[in-house]
From Swiss-Prot:
Is involved in the degradation of n-alkanes with C chain lengths of 32 and longer. Allows Acinetobacter sp. strain DSM 17874 to grow on long-chain n-alkanes such as dotriacontane (C32H66) or hexatriacontane (C36H74) as a sole carbon source. It comes from Acinetobacter sp. GO terms for cellular component: plasma membrane. The chain crosses the membrane at residues 4-24. Keywords: Cell membrane, FAD, Flavoprotein, Membrane, Monooxygenase, NADP, Oxidoreductase, Transmembrane, Transmembrane helix. This is Probable FAD-binding monooxygenase AlmA. Pathway: Hydrocarbon metabolism; alkane degradation. Disruption phenotype: Cells lacking this gene can no longer utilize n-alkanes with C chain lengths of 32 and 36, but can still grow with C24, C20, C16 alkanes or acetate as a sole carbon source. The lineage of its organism: Bacteria, Pseudomonadati, Pseudomonadota, Gammaproteobacteria, Moraxellales.
Length: 497
């Protein structure tokens, strides 16, 4: 028998849990359920188990607006974040709303019934169909089954362990081992000091090109001080507002004065290295925030490099050998373990094939209305967090907008909403904008497209988005509402090419 729900949330990570709380508080009349393919909640924070896994943005802004992160630790570990999410689930009675081990295979919108028919498979390979008025994509934007794994020349000759961080072996013993980490992004710069601390013999970070890295304190001393003469709530609000402003300010400065921000970042790195490491390894060729700015707590990466427990090589791989990696410069890196921290493989909606009346959708041909609603697709929203600020900031304001939209529809007796796009608004860039990171560049045929102007342009500006989504009117000429039984004219879903 077909199970029916009002709102079906795909994914029980940060986005799905956040949306569920907002729905329970603001749309109590609506029944919702969460489908999660894994056996636990948390998304990223359940999947990644490598040493040192942590947030890369401050927890005062990474925490939900309805549950303060009331600690002075700036960056939290994966386990701490999952514990925080566990508390959110318990405090909001969400446990029975989450269906673990349920993979969504496909979702087809029936324009006559004004409902989504969603095919699901559980871990026992048993299939079932659910129907839903709304489908909410809260799956993040990468493939949980595999990361980006380029094939290196002669990789099969290597006799040691070859590991991708997305599939970290349980109880891996790297004590005294020579470790080479390929990559220079957030994962690599987290792994290096963590594996040094964990007893690795030596850790080498092998990169093709440098990344901008900023040092931040591990403890928020200002928050620590303000709590002594302010209430807990006031101190938290002050800290959150300050950090939101700092995030936005640094990004805006980098866009307007890239040379100045570059000079400041490089000076900060130089002070950390203290002449012990050549600055060429930390001097990128691109401008700050053309790729995501990485952060390290208390300069832990630079400390490991200064003390000789770790090293960095900027070079290209010629081939693997039985006991390491031969570089094009002629240098050979000996390794017992090689870790390929080479990035993510982008995937939208968790790989779910969407369709409208049986006609397949191609997400790369759609835009996002107000950064939330999928263009020309009825009753579907997608929550994708910020690339230049804490992910959760977008979750909160997007979820609040979705709740307002649903309540507007209920008040007026509508069953369907469609954000009709003007094709001339569609840019070639994806919703990630001008970001040049490798994993984003590889996703051009998967990611929704950027729009030229509001309400289709993704600004990645939390302060502007918060005001826009809070004040947004639903009778703007873009959103079209229908009741069951009405014919929907001229809908042309984008076919898979």
């Amino acid at each position: 028998m077909e199970k029916q729900v009002d709102v079906l949330i795909i994914g029980a990570g940060i986005s799905g849990i956040g949306l569920a709380v907002h729905l329970s508080k603001n749309c109590p009349q609506r029944k919702f359920e969460i489908l999660e393919r894994r056996e636990s909640f948390g998304g990223t924070w359940d999947l990644f188990r490598y040493p040192g896994i942590r947030s890369d943005s401050d927890m005062s802004t990474f925490g939900f607006n309805f549950k303060p992160w009331a600690k002075d630790k700036v960056l939290a570990s994966g386990a701490e974040i999952k514990g925080y999410l566990s508390d959110v689930i318990s405090e909001n009675q969400l446990k029975d709303k989450i269906h673990f081990g349920h993979r969504v295979l496909s979702a087809n919108y029936d324009s006559t019934k004004k409902k989504w028919l969603v095919e699901i498979e559980d871990n026992n390979k048993k299939k079932q169909t659910w129907s839903a008025n709304f489908v909410m994509g809260c799956t993040g934007y990468y493939n949980y089954d595999q990361g980006y794994a380029p094939k290196f020349p002669k990789q099969e000759d290597f006799k040691g362990q070859f590991i991708h961080p997305q599939h970290w072996p349980e109880n891996l013993d790297y004590t005294g081992k020579k470790v080479v980490i390929i990559g220079s992004g957030a994962t690599a710069i987290t792994l290096v000091p963590s594996m040094v601390k964990g007893g690795a013999g030596h850790v080498t970070m092998l990169q093709r090109s440098p990344t901008y890295i900023a040092t931040i304190p591990s403890i928020d001393f200002i928050y620590e001080k303000t709590r002594k003469f302010m209430s807990e709530e006031t101190a938290y609000k002050f800290t959150r507002a300050r950090n939101i402003g700092m995030q936005r300010g640094i990004y805006a400065l980098a866009q307007k004065y890239p040379k100045t921000v570059r000079r400041l970042l490089l000076k900060g790195i130089e002070l950390q290295l203290k002449g012990k490491v050549d600055m060429k390894h930390f001097t990128p060729s691109y401008n700050p925030w053309d790729q995501r700015l990485c952060v390290v707590p208390d300069g832990d990466l630079f400390k490991a490099l200064r003390e000789g427990q770790a090293s960095v090589e900027t070079d290209q791989i010629e081939k693997f050998t039985a006991n390491g990696i031969q570089l094009k410069s002629g240098k050979h890196l000996e390794a017992d373990i090689v870790i390929s921290a080479t990035g993510l493989e982008i995937q939208i909606l968790g790989g779910v094939q969407g369709s409208i009346d049986g006609k397949p959708m191609n997400t790369s041909q759609h835009m996002l209305y107000q950064g939330v609603m999928v263009s020309d697709v009825p009753n579907m929203a997608m929550i994708i967090g910020y690339i230049n600020a804490s992910w959760t900031l977008k979750v909160d304001i997007a979820a609040d907008y979705i709740c307002r939209l649903i309540n507007h529809m209920d008040k007026n007796g509508f069953d369907e909403v469609i954000a009709h796009a003007d094709p001339s608004q569609r840019e070639n860039d994806t919703i990630m904008g001008k970001m040049s990171s490798g994993y984003i560049a590889r996703a051009a045929d998967v990611m929704p497209k950027q729009g030229k102007q509001a309400p289709w342009k993704i600004t990645n500006n939390y302060l502007a988005d918060r005001k826009e989504l809070k004040d947004a009117k639903f009778n703007d000429g873009v959103l079209e509402f229908h009741k069951r039984g009405e014919q929907t004219a001229n809908r042309k879903p984008k076919l898979v090419s």
